[in-house]
Amino acid sequence: MTNIISVDTLLSASKLTCIREERILFDELSFEINAGDIVQIEGPNGAGKTSLLRILAGLSRPYAGQTFYVNEDINRCRDEYNEDLLYLGHLAGVKSELTAEENLNFNLRISGYDDFDTSAILAKVNLSGFEEALAGHLSAGQHRRTALARLWHNDCKIWILDEPFTAIDKRGVEELEQLFIKHADNGGCVILTTHQDMGIIKDDRLRKIRLDYRFV
């Protein structure tokens, strides 16, 4: 099935339904996310925010409905979609036995990049001087910034981020917000969850999708 959408639409959902343990987390949820959009998924704990992000990233299947990358079901264009997708879950995905530099190097290389300066990238997330520190010895904030560093060297259009501001201080949150705006202005989109208020991305720039679960 082909979904007819706007030429600016990068990602769309058609009648997505998700059920977990006899709870309907969301039902026949449809929306379009366009180039330039910054979208926050809202809802109480257990409402299905992470489940929705995982479905959009193709990591979980919905009970019903489809997700489309441009005009194609993501299950029919998996390679193309994955090349244009950066997904960061609420877990950092950082290996404790590797240094900050080794983690970044590993993450960028498995994403297909081979020309980058890890020290310069880590400096952008205030990790200068910690390049050789084992990730297991870093603070929670440094650990999270190690995971987020790949955002500063990435050409994927679609960013799906689960709680990117966790353990990040106010300055770090502002720097991430500025990066999100720049990415969107360059034709990408950002889909995220967060429990924190955003100070730089204003309501007129931020789209919101709210989830509220109910029992079957």
UniProtKB/Swiss-Prot annotation:
Location relative to the cell: Cell inner membrane
Stretches assigned to the ABC transporter domain: 5-216
Enzyme Commission code(s) on record: 7.6.2.5
Domain of life of the native organism: Bacteria
Entry keywords, A to Z: ATP-binding, Cell inner membrane, Cell membrane, Cytochrome c-type biogenesis, Membrane, Nucleotide-binding, Translocase, Transport
Membrane topology classification: Peripheral membrane protein
A single GO molecular function term of this UniProt record: ATP hydrolysis activity
EC primary class: translocase
SMART domains referenced in this protein's UniProt entry, alphabetically: AAA (SM00382)
This protein's name: Cytochrome c biogenesis ATP-binding export protein CcmA
Lineage: Bacteria, Pseudomonadati, Pseudomonadota, Gammaproteobacteria, Alteromonadales
Recorded name of the encoding gene: ccmA
